């Protein structure tokens, strides 16, 4: 998880907005799944952050802003997407939007880690 966040920062610093977004998606997904493992059993093979958060009980503890963030980051799971979909997503990203995404990812990551400490 921490490595993915470092990779996201490196990608951001080199102007790779789309792949910064993908790594942010990975950070959130892996952190949610870590929480799931502490609360339940093996996490499901899903990439839907909202479903993972609901399944492990975190969703009801989230602010509306955090829930909106989960909804917005869905589109950044580009690993298996067709090139035209990647291109469409890439056109929505720039330094400003990706910087905000990276900061929100760091905040969500830290928040989930705090919730893990409470377990």
Model region roles, listed by residue range:
Residues 1-119:
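Terminal alpha-helical segments
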